Amino acid sequence: MKQSLTSKIVTSVLCFVCHSKYEKSATRSNTLANKTNNKKSYFHPIGFRTERIKCGECYLEKISPNKNVSKKAIFHIHGGSFKVKLTDFYRRESVYYSRLFNNATVYNVDYRVYPDVRFPIPLDDVYNCYLSVIKNENANNIVVIGDSCGANMAVSLCMKLRDNSKPLPSSVILFSFWGDLSNSGSSYKENCHRDPFYGIPKRISYEDAKDKIHRITLYAQGEDLYNPYLSPCFGSFADFPKTILVCGSADLGQSDSFTAYEKLKSEGVETYLFDYENMFHDFQMLKFLPESRNVFKRIKDIIQP
């Protein structure tokens, strides 16, 4: 799909705002994460109810429509660089997913985050929550959705389920898959000036900012970055469920989606890759963009409610 005029304008504005404040981006990101994590203001919309369920050392939030039509159940793993808790924004996303799939029940994983914990605890939380969900839901009806680091854990979850002979979900949807925490794919250089959120201003060269672009998140500090449960791009995708990957050609981590797609195809897995021209990391969150509307229509056509 050719990039829309709307998204061109949005991308230009985001690049101007984010790149002009690049030097302070890490500090602002951490400050925003702390503010967001401490915010408690969510009210579920009319027609839905929310139940917060203790699951080991973390929580599941079950969002149920009052009129449940779909047999599907959404297992939602939010993003946020492993340092943002389940927020109001992601709760609203989950309501959107419920409506997209004809009033499906959604399970949001409120996993523990950095700096309180590090790898592998968030993945363990996700794994334990999934096992709790399949006590009441048929795994054949479950769709796992994750974005960015949530997509990372969605893939790691499937690997861990497979490795432990547990039931896998029916399908997986990955938005802006961050699957290589060594950040060694080709797009980390090629798109370093194009991604509004994780890229760098054009006034700074790739070589001068190489350490920041190939940053090692503190979540994984001291770990083997080639561990498939941490960087699933380096793992096996054998026996995976149907998988949809969504990325943009301006996303810093675009190559991670390409790597996963090629591995899935080589294993004979039913897989789809939707790569949108000049689109940025997690663009689908801006629902007014024509590209976002397009990709959700394609997803719905593939995964019938």
What positions do the PLM features span?
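A glycine/proline-hinged amphipathic helix-loop "lid/cap" segment
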Residues: 1-65
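Alpha/beta-hydrolase superfamily serine-hydrolase fold, recognizing
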Residues: 9, 17-18, 51, 55-305
